[in-house]
């Protein structure tokens, strides 16, 4: 099993990829199980916890980035530059495992365009397209 932290700079509590099932030049399939211990559930919403839509989009983008790094290598960081066509179709609750299916639409040395869908079981929960710029992290 691949150590996700070797593929992404994100760390707890903002690492949203548990495992990668498939990663090739066209597609990534990865998973994230959201537990009741997620810090954002304390405020979104305490009486009826739901994974925020922005976290689902971040999860898709992290899955896409980790999968691309796994299949193609490289050392540059991915910086979200645009999010388009985001739609949320089903609530994701504590205990749900999300299956992310991400397609590489365009990959170059300096940018990445992907589209992804997040499923709980066979039910579509969210979908979006995004653009990432690829570059080195600024030094402090």
Model-derived features: positions:
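Hydrophobic core residues within well-ordered beta-strands of beta-rich domains
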Residues: 14-16, 98, 112
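Short Pro/Gly-enriched beta-strand edge/turn motifs at strand-loop
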Residues: 1-4, 96-100
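Hydrophobic beta-strand-centered segment that forms part of the acyl-chain substrate-binding groove
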Residues: 63-99, 125, 132-133
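Catalytic strand-loop segment that frames the active site of acyl-thioester-processing enzymes
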Residues: 12-51
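Flexible, low-complexity linker/boundary loops enriched in proline and small hydrophobic residues
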Residues: 1-21, 132
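Compact, glycine-rich, soluble single-domain proteins
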Residues: 41-68, 80
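HotDog/MaoC-like acyl-thioester-processing domains
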Residues: 25-27, 92-96, 103-140
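Beta-strand-rich interaction surfaces with strong enrichment in secreted/lumenal proteins
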Residues: 5, 47, 88-90
